[in-house]
């Protein structure tokens, strides 16, 4: 049986991988904000002792992995395989960044740096296969970081404080290496729109409580 010309067995394999990776994201969400080693024998023992499956993360990651396989597809071309692999690697890191930022309003430098380093490796690998694609990804990093850096600086001048943290600047610089300059502009616009909507909702709910 095939879905979008891909054998359903591949979806099952990717889905199971997503379940495992989703639970690993929970592990990272605990370790990274504390600036501790992700892999630690002592923590592993403690984690497994109090182990609780994070079903939302597990099934959410599994769904995203299968969606990536569906939309990116499978190809015998090396550059397409690299493209699929980089999104499978990026997904759990983005989920971890979102969860930590939502809870603590920070994005750990180690997480941003890891994304940047992995993005750089894929940029160089894809650039060797297609120089134009490599340049596009490099420009994506410059544009992504540049847009958020400008907004952060302008926000600081107008409001006297950062409009957003430099963790966001680093994050967008790293994401640019994965998506390229055109997509990172679209992602930036979507991010601003979502941030504006969330801010309006929070302000409205706060005002309602004070009335």
Task: Name each region found by the language model.
Residues 1-211:
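A membrane-topology feature that recognizes alpha-helical transmembrane segments
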């Amino acid at each position: 049986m095939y879905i979008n010309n891909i054998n359903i067995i591949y979806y099952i394999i990717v889905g199971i991988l997503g379940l495992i990776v989703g639970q690993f994201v929970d592990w990272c969400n605990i370790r990274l904000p504390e600036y501790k080693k992700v892999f630690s024998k002592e923590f592993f023992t403690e984690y497994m002792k109090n182990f609780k499956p994070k079903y939302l993360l597990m099934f959410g990651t599994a769904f995203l992995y299968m969606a990536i396989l569906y939309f990116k597809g499978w190809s015998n071309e090396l550059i397409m395989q690299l493209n699929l692999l980089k999104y499978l690697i990026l997904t759990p890191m983005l989920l971890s960044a979102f969860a930590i930022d939502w809870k603590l309003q920070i994005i750990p430098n180690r997480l941003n740096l890891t994304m940047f380093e992995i993005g750089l490796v894929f940029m160089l690998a894809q650039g060797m296969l297609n120089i134009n694609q490599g340049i596009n990804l490099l420009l994506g990093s410059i544009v992504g970081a540049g847009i958020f850096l400008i907004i952060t600086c302008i926000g600081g001048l107008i409001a006297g404080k950062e409009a957003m943290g430099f963790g966001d600047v680093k994050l967008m610089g790293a994401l640019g290496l994965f998506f390229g300059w055109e997509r990172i502009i679209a992602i930036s616009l979507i991010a601003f729109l979502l941030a504006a909507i969330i801010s309006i909702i929070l302000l409205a709910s706060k005002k309602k409580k004070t009335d």
